[in-house]
Amino acid sequence: MRENPPGKGGRLTMEKWDLLDGDGRPLGQTLVRGDKLRPGQYHLVVHIWVEDSKGRLLIQKRAPHLKLMPDTWAVTGGSALAGEDSLTAAARELSEELGIEAAPSDLKLLGRLRRRNSLCDLWRLRRDVPLSALRLQKEEVADARWVSRGQLMEMVKCRRFHHYGSPYFDFLFRSLDGEPDILPVK
């Protein structure tokens, strides 16, 4: 995720998103981050779940100064930039936020969820990554850790992990277990 990313010379740059319809078709328009979406307009968001050989999931703690969900554990992800496809956005977010480089063939699309103002593509990367090998993006990420699914859901219950909604987690776990990809709409 990116909040007011620094540009050249330390100035803030405007992040632009492509506008999509509810089926993911481009509307031929862009929106500057922070501007309000109208009904029927969506932007593309990617969530990348890194899963190790023990079935644990890599989560990250958002930096304390962020406006949206500060000091909250969440999945790695963010909005696709204008002109960027979902796969490119997923690889970029992994690299920026955690320092994990992934080839396109390493990432598997689990499916897409329609949310209030976004179409959220869930991706999986299967990789054993030592925490010591991560390069956290200090502007956005304060910490990272591996958790089991049970630990993750306990964190959701105790409000220490962002609650994306029960349908989200149901879909995520079904997809990680290899059930057929379903594209539920919320």
Question: Where would I find each of the regions flagged by the language model?
Answer:
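Short, Lys/Arg-enriched N-terminal segments with co-localized hydrophobic residues
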Residues: 3-13
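Nudix hydrolase/Nudix homology domain
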Residues: 11, 34, 70-71, 114-186
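Acidic, metal-coordinating catalytic segment for phosphate/diphosphate chemistry
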Residues: 12-47, 53
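Conserved hydrophobic "DFG−1" position in protein kinase catalytic cores
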Residues: 19, 50, 59, 124-125, ...
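Short loop segments at secondary-structure junctions
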Residues: 23, 52-55, 63, 126-130, ...
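A glycine-rich, hydrophobic loop/mini-helix early in the fold
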Residues: 45-77
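The catalytic Nudix box helix
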Residues: 58-59, 75-108
